[in-house]
Each structure stands twice: as structure tokens, then as C-alpha cells.
Amino acid sequence: GIYFYPSLMFSLVASICAFFTYKKSKLFCISIVLFNCILIFLHGNKGPIFSIFIAFILYLSYIENKKIKFMFLVKSFAVIAVIVTAFFAYTFTDGNPIENMANYSDYTRNAVLVASSNFDFMYGKLLMESEVYSRIPRAIWPDKPEDFGALYLAKVFFPDAFYRNQGAPAFGYGELYADFGLFTPVWLVISGVFKGVLAKYFSNKTQETKSAHYFIMFLFCIGISVIPVSMGWLFPEHLMIAFMVYIASSFVFSEHIRFVLLRNNK
């Protein structure tokens, strides 16, 4: 809730900013990242661990200009896979751990459920609601609908869970299909090109400035979010986070520490 997601977000941001100390102090960088990884595990969330690892690989490539060997990636992913599997076995005491991991593919089954139904296409209504309604606090709009965006699909396909106020299960591409129907590939191409242009822009700025705020935006544009929620395209929120990281760097008086957030190109 109000503490869970911000805590994960700050752990991710702290880990990414810690990467920028890697060249000066590997011990400090690794200590900060490991500490935040432990915090993330204590939240019961595994996805951000992969995000931190991939972000670090991208940091080495885009900031430190190092070549990443293929076998290093294979070994690293194997270690992380073993750790995550062990975490599943430890936290899920009921049933088979493999079956519990397989249940994470529910979004695929839900997408097929939507695609194989006679659901009337919404032509962008669900997307608009997810992007707009989700950002309006209920304190400001007391009559805000309960069934907007993916929640409307939950109401249609999983009414029992919806009326028990259990939220919306992940529908994957099913949510887009419910919106655009046969035009879904067209939307994916258009949105993909737009996001690709943004990713290229922030990639260039990251390599040019070697700074954390541009790096955070680059990560978001290629699919690595520091805000662990699934609803909506959180571009404005990531801009705000990147801006706060930039502002924080301007209040650091020591040039020895300042490179952590905003490197000097001298």
C-alpha cells in the first residue's frame, strides 16, 4: 500500500544511484546494492532484483563503456535464477514450488480468455481511463468509478474477485486487445516507435552526460521501471523522479561525492 510501493521505489533508485560510485568504490557500491536487494526480498518481490541486475549491466555498457561478455551474462542469470527459485521454495510452503512459479503465467491465460470471448472492443477507452483516472485521487473525485481500465475487465471476467475488492488480475496483451481488437498490432507498432525514439534520445543523453537522472529515464524507456506498479504508462512519474535526482545532486557540496548523481564532464 502506501508504504510498500514507495519503499520498493526508493530501494531501486538508491541502487541505481549507487552504480555511479562503482568506479570510485566498488565496496561501497556493492554494499548499497546488496542492502537494497535484501530489503526488496523482505518485501516478497522478486522482479526488481532482475531489474537491478539488468540496470547494472546497462550501466557498465553505457556509462563505463565496458564490453559485456556473453558467458558473464549466462553465469549471472543462472545465479539469479537459482536464488529466485530458492526464494520461491522458501516462501511458498503450500504446494509445489514449480507450480507456484507457473501460476505467474496467469496473465497469458487471462489474455487468451479476453481474446476468445465476445467482448466488445472499447477503442481506447480502457487505455484513457488507466492513464487519466488512475492519477486522480479519490479525495478530489469522490465519485470516481470503481471499474475503470483493467478493473473493468476484472468486473466482466472475474466478478467475484472484483466485488470482493481484490483488484484486477494481469491481462497482459488482453487489455490492449479489449481496447483495439484487430488494430492491436497497429497500436503496438505506433507506441513502440514512439517509445523507441524516446529511448534513443535518453540513451544519447546518458552517454553524453554520464548522469543518473538521464540513466533512470533511459531505463524506463526500455522497460525497466523504478516504480513497481503495472497500471498506466508512468513516464510523467519517472520524469519527476529523475528531476528530483537532478535537484538532489545540486545540493551536494563535495565534488568528491557529487559525481554519484551528476558527473562533471571536465
Where are these regions (language model features)?
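Aromatic-rich transmembrane-lumenal/periplasmic boundary elements in polytopic membrane proteins
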Residues: 70-148
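Hydrophobic alpha-helical segments
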Residues: 12-13, 19-21, 168-266
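Short aromatic-rich membrane-water interface segments that cap or initiate transmembrane helices
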Residues: 1-5, 116, 176-178
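Structural motif marking the loop-to-transmembrane transition
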Residues: 4-6, 23-31, 46, 50, ...
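Membrane-embedded catalytic interface detector for glycan/lipid assembly enzymes
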Residues: 1-67, 80-94
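Central hydrophobic cores of alpha-helical transmembrane segments
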Residues: 28-38, 74-81, 189-193, 213-221
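Long extracytoplasmic/lumenal interhelical loops at the membrane interface
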Residues: 127, 132-183
